[in-house]
């Protein structure tokens, strides 16, 4: 206790508070009880990247989803040539995820169980719009320990139209005409921008209509193109076609294996 | 600190096993592991089996930390007993799913089980009908990343052998016989032996067959052909 | 749990009373249980390690923006006045433009919007929480919530997560019984009322245009043009902004969302208006 004048007391108090806050911060970052083993543990990288790419295109009455089936270790070593990144959640919802495969599996499990419960509670299948919001929320719930995934949800909405929803790892949602995620995203998207978005076409030129056939060929092209230039994409195209009022069709098409 | 530092600073496993090689044949799965547990580069424990028989349908082989696998054996045993209470035998698919969740949950606590597990078995599609049973190989890495395969090599084998085993598999596919599959595995071990310094020449081949169930292998030895060493040394 | 017996129906009245009680009470602060990192790991450091530039391009969070809003009074009786909210539509993950068509004006109520700058997911999620609160408030109090109250709730919620790495820079703009109001709210818990406001990476460029041309009294056409102009110029100087310009005009009676305008086309429009050739002319 040095002085009783107000100013010094306040100054002391603020100073003390600042020091206290600093100490709190330090102790929160490095608690004393933490053993070196625990500190080591925290430096461990809980994520890995299994590579691969996924893409979805929606049209007037259809949505098609594709992914490659390669799974790599450190982007270099191919672990398996038939890892599936697409999950058909019900007749009109398809989830496709790239990124850390453990999270991909977890996300699939979370959505499957939520959809199951929805069926149990409401005795109907969930619509793709609802599921899209559900996924967004579930991604955000892991805001502070995110899923290391780029998810795309596609399907047929309540009006029979194709829908594609694109997400970032923590659940920023946007409905788009087409979307891609994963290692080859920066390659596939410009191609689709050109072919479907027609961003490079001047006004007054004819814009080809996006039919199912055209969408499928574009999808094949984009993956074959990506497999030529991207190391962790290849082996097989896993193609899922959802058309309004028709059952979901699944196809596997060959891709470069090198 | 950059991203690479933390990989290096990781809490390292102590006593480890190396590659597991497994291959599916017509009616079952063969699994090969060597019988050594290393402490760094030292061959610390010899004559240790790295395969664990869960029940008549499932066999688990591990690569990675030996202690963690022992802990896992306990957990698995409990799970098997739990199923027994409902008069069920746990199948390879179910166990694979369970272990995936377990390893993922441990990862989320940043306290990983330092194992790469290979769940080999025969999945019974219909109860007591061996005709419809299908062979199953499932792999789980320590981060909870799981997948099913027809053939697999883990550890250093993932780099050395995956393609070699795949090529053999593609020649015959589903029609591979047990003898042929075992021959492929023996050849593969020889290859790891040449290049993996913690691999051992004592090994065992376990198998899960639709009719015979799990048959744990006997200890075998391989010498290999070291004449290739002449062409592959830069240290004379 | 598994089924209802007839006895259960007798409890209905009690339950109704309970439900009413719950409805009258002020809803608790949004208490989400987010999955947490194990004790001792700082989320901010963790994100920096795994989701910053070192991560794959597609694994970075979407961000980057120019948003602006201003209040003006009608210059002539024919004009409506109110608030202009204008935003760009680019979301970038690092150097990669992960979306060029993001809607950054999010609805909170019939008469209120929030803009989105900073982490896209953070804004989307928390804006919905605020919207839910506002709707519940309206149902409970039978009057629409003031912009001030809504933004206060927003700021308080964000303050609860301060220092954990949220990234939100939002403007809550709307018309209520006190008139047109804009509140800027950010993830540090800051909240302040402004007449002219811009947030995001391109905000300084937007301010440059805005402060130059802003007048307290404007015609509707002038005001809308000003919003477009400021966004357009900001997108030309800030690489984190771009795409189309979305504009929302909140008048005393309604909320008008204008169709998106491509900023590349706007450039030519404004060049024409200035009577200037778009090619660079050093002599001039």
UniProtKB/Swiss-Prot annotation, chain A:
SUPFAM superfamilies: N-terminal nucleophile aminohydrolases (Ntn hydrolases). Non-catalytic component of the proteasome, a multicatalytic proteinase complex which is characterized by its ability to cleave peptides with Arg, Phe, Tyr, Leu, and Glu adjacent to the leaving group at neutral or slightly basic pH. The proteasome has an ATP-dependent proteolytic activity. Pfam families: Proteasome. The lineage of its organism: Eukaryota, Metazoa, Ecdysozoa, Nematoda, Chromadorea. One of its GO terms (cellular component) is nucleus. It comes from the Eukaryota. This is Proteasome subunit beta type-1. GO terms for biological process: proteasome-mediated ubiquitin-dependent protein catabolic process. Belongs to the peptidase T1B family. It is found in: Cytoplasm; Nucleus. The 26S proteasome consists of a 20S proteasome core and two 19S regulatory subunits. The 20S proteasome core is composed of 28 subunits that are arranged in four stacked rings, resulting in a barrel-shaped structure. The two end rings are each formed by seven alpha subunits, and the two central rings are each formed by seven beta subunits. The catalytic chamber with the active sites is on the inside of the barrel. The keyword Cytoplasm applies. Keywords: Cytoplasm, Nucleus, Proteasome.
Swiss-Prot record, chain C:
Disulfide bonds: none annotated. It is found in: Cytoplasm; Nucleus. Transmembrane segments: none annotated. One of its GO terms (cellular component) is nucleus. One of its GO terms (biological process) is proteasome-mediated ubiquitin-dependent protein catabolic process. GO terms for molecular function: endopeptidase activity; threonine-type endopeptidase activity. Residues 1-64 form a propeptide. It catalyses: Cleavage of peptide bonds with very broad specificity. Its main location: cytoplasm. InterPro entries: Ntn_hydrolases_N, Pept_T1A_subB, Proteasome_sua/b, Proteasome_suB-type. Disruption phenotype: No visible phenotype. Constitutive skn-1-dependent expression of the proteasomal subunit rpt-3. Double knockout with ddi-1, sel-1, sel-9, png-1 or skn-1a results in failed expression of the proteasomal subunit rpt-3. Its EC number is 3.4.25.1. Belongs to the peptidase T1B family. Component of the 20S core proteasome complex involved in the proteolytic degradation of most intracellular proteins. This complex plays numerous essential roles within the cell by associating with different regulatory particles. Associated with two 19S regulatory particles, forms the 26S proteasome and thus participates in the ATP-dependent degradation of ubiquitinated proteins. This is Proteasome subunit pbs-5. It comes from Caenorhabditis elegans. The gene is pbs-5.
